[in-house]
Amino acid sequence: AACQLGTAASFARDKQDYPAVRSDGRQDSKDSTLDRIAKRCSEGGDFCSKNSECCDKKCQDEGEGRGVCLIVPQNVILLH
């Protein structure tokens, strides 16, 4: 049983390391951009500044050069 548990834990850990790659080798559509896969942008809820870019391009200024990336729901059109 311990051996099976270790295998399950190992599988779960491996799956977490590569969440954007499906078992058939294709990228998951929700993480289809290179920026998200390479984590070159900040996700919603992460801190941001004028020197860092949010994946959804929405950094809410919190003052003193700090901000928070807004969480933008999918399938919602933002008006500027």
Swiss-Prot record:
Q: Which GO terms describe its molecular function?
A: ion channel regulator activity; toxin activity
- Protein location: Secreted
Give disulfide pairs as residue numbers. Answer: 41-55, 48-59, 54-69
The signal peptide annotation in the UniProt record is 1-8
Q: Which residues form the propeptide?
A: 9-40
Comment on protein domains: The presence of a 'disulfide through disulfide knot' structurally defines this protein as a knottin. The cysteine framework is VI/VII (C-C-CC-C-C).
What protein family does this chain belong to? Answer: Belongs to the conotoxin O1 superfamily.
Write down what this protein is called. Conotoxin Bu14
The organism encoding this protein is Conus bullatus
